[in-house]
Amino acid sequence: LFLTSKLFANSEVIYGGFSYGSILPKNTLTKYVHDRSNGQSLIDKLLINNIKKLDNKSFKISFDTLSDGLSEKDQNVLVFSLDNETINFITIQGDNLTRTDIILNFQIIFFNAKNNSLTASIPLEVSKVLNSSEPLSEKQLIQELKKMYENEVMQNFFNLANNFNLKNKYNSRIGITKIILEENAENFINKNSKSNDIFKKNRFAKSLSSFLSYNNNIAVVPYGEDRTSNTIMLTFENTQREIKLPNPDYHIHLTVRGFKSVLFKEGAIDEQWIYGSYVKIQLIQPDLDKIYFEEKFKNGLNVEFSKRATKNKNSFEWIFYLDSLKILFDEFSKQTIKIDKKWLKSSSDNKKIKKSFKKISEIYEKCK
């Protein structure tokens, strides 16, 4: 019994703290929540408190610094990295309403400090919608960010880190490796985003991978098509580290096909519009030149406006297309946990699609 427990003892992981990934601190409001001018930041304190509560059977956290005598398997480091912070707002003038969306993208990174290679990465997207009568000030946004870090961010971080099965090596890995924007989708996205936004594809990859990971408890190799090299940068022990990313065995290709809205119902004072999002998702194994999954999906989101607001809806309705798309990502990723016949019937024309999700589920298991 003693030998058995030693053989399966959980790995020791060095706590690496909070880091910025592919986003510069100066381009965020998180920098005010992660202010270390007077010692530990609020994020530092929250993260340490949650790390201490972890009860994961596959690893235990050490707050010691790395030493030269550690074996390779004991040089895994955990870093919680902010990869993107997006704050958008729309104003619906007819209803005197401002909607603010805060979207935070993170990676829970486990990497080997001896060779700077990725062990596992768990993507996390946390979003919050705020309604107000006028645009929020920077001070108000910072307060809302603090609340997000104290609540939704740390709750999701804890749940993901506590339930994840960490291994020193994985037999198979999965990742989103290609984002294709068809003409309809690209025209829409370019119209509603900065023309020089080289990371626009990255945002779709982050969102889909976060839902896949959260709902299926799997690690996902970070998307790298918009990067110049197959690495990511992290800060650990006050130095920049370039972490090498493995090539996934299983590749997910996401094609965003387009967006469309239709008037569903019209009343005397209100209108209901359906905002549709359309995608194609493929799961392939390039080494075997094998396609395991290739299906088209659509999702409709019902939104009600006053007739006053619809006069100006072209200026703000893009946010509802993105809402529709994220619901599609979420529902798609849940089908490998439990089939939702109602959603599949409305989102896919393939009546035999349930068998395809069974195959995806088997592949996910190989990546755990």
Residue ranges: model-predicted function:
Residues L1-V13:
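Bacterial Sec-dependent N-terminal signal peptides
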Residues N10-D83, N187-E266, Y275-Y278, I284-A309, ...:
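N-terminal segment of the mature soluble domain
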Residues S71-K73, T100, N115-S117:
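Edge/loop elements at the starts and ends of beta-strands within beta-rich repeat scaffolds
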Residues Q75-I87, L97-F110:
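Elongated alpha-helical scaffolds
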Residues T98-Q107, K194-K201, A205-S207, K366:
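Short, low-complexity, polybasic intrinsically disordered segments
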Residues A113-E186, K206, N216, E271, ...:
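C-terminal/domain-edge helix-coil "capping" segments
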